[in-house]
Regions:
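Glycine-rich oxoanion-binding loops at beta->alpha junctions
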Residues: 1-2
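Glycine-rich, often proline-containing surface loops adjacent to acidic residues and nearby aromatics
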Residues: 5-9, 65-68
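Glycine/charged-rich beta-loop-alpha catalytic/anionic-binding loops adjacent to active sites
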Residues: 6-11, 38-54
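A short, small-residue-rich loop immediately preceding and capping a beta-strand
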Residues: 9-13, 87-90
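Short Gly/Thr/Asp-enriched flexible loops that form oxyanion-binding sites at enzyme active sites
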Residues: 12-43, 67
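Mixed-charge interfacial surface used for oligomerization/domain docking
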Residues: 27-30, 52, 58-68, 72-219, ...
Length: 235
């Protein structure tokens, strides 16, 4: 429920290609601006109420870093239209690294996005040989960076890659990690501790949280996802 004093709402929606959430939010925004604007005027508030909806375009729901940067800019006193403009430019710089825990990840993901299965057969064979893929997602693109022997090795490589990006410099000072399991086990990993140290040294905020149910169902129990801002497109 919105307070009458609320001047604006800024929503970063799930990627439009992933479903109807973005279009539904646009429709809801129009209705909300009319209804809430009317309610404010009845209480003598002349300032117009506005709502913005941004298509995150990120793969696997990598909105976390976008939300963090949005909050930082607003706290710094940046105007909402300028924040929307900056977030729009940053969307394509979100890199998501995923270590799936389930061999059917590619099959489920391709069915969700309506794409041909990505390396589904080779991944299935690799899993039999205890080879775990490190998957990189950016926008609509999904690719296997490498396959490593064992899940723990793939997780370590993901953290090492992001640690290097933090040291090189990020487009925005945030890294979001989500895990489909007990977060305590992640905090104890040497590679995560090294990432924490790098973030502290370079004034980057690191968030660790439980993975959403929807993503956990997609990538499997025990899977890991890391969302940093890369320094440059194509980094």
């Amino acid at each position: 429920r919105l307070l009458a004093s609320t001047d604006f709402v800024l929503e970063i929606a799930q990627a439009s290609r992933r479903g109807n959430a973005y279009m539904n939010s646009l429709t809801a925004a129009q209705n909300l601006m009319l209804q809430h604007g009317r309610a404010r005027r009845q209480q003598g508030i002349a300032r117009p109420f506005k709502m913005w909806v941004i298509d995150s375009t990120t793969a696997l729901n990598g909105q976390g870093v976008l939300v963090c940067e949005c909050a930082r800019l607003l706290d710094d006193g940046i105007s909402v239209p300028r924040v929307v403009q900056q977030i729009d430019g940053l969307r394509q710089q979100v890199r998501t690294l995923v270590v799936p825990a389930d061999v059917s990840f590619f099959q489920r993901r391709s069915r969700l996005d309506g794409e041909a299965p990505l390396a589904w057969l080779s991944y299935g064979v690799g899993k039999v040989l205890d080879r775990t893929p490190l998957v990189r997602a950016q926008g609509a693109e999904l690719s296997v960076v490498t396959q490593l022997r064992g899940f723990d090795a793939a997780v370590a490589r993901a953290f090492e890659s992001v640690t290097q990006q933090v040291r090189t410099g990020l487009a925005a000072p945030f890294v979001c990690v989500s895990f489909a399991g007990d977060e305590t086990s992640v905090r104890q990993l040497p590679a995560f501790i090294a990432l924490e140290d790098a973030c502290l040294r370079h004034q980057v905020t690191l968030h660790l949280a439980s993975m959403s149910m929807g993503n956990a169902l997609l990538v499997g129990r025990g899977a890991l996802r890391v969302d940093p801002f890369a320094l440059h497109v194509g980094h």
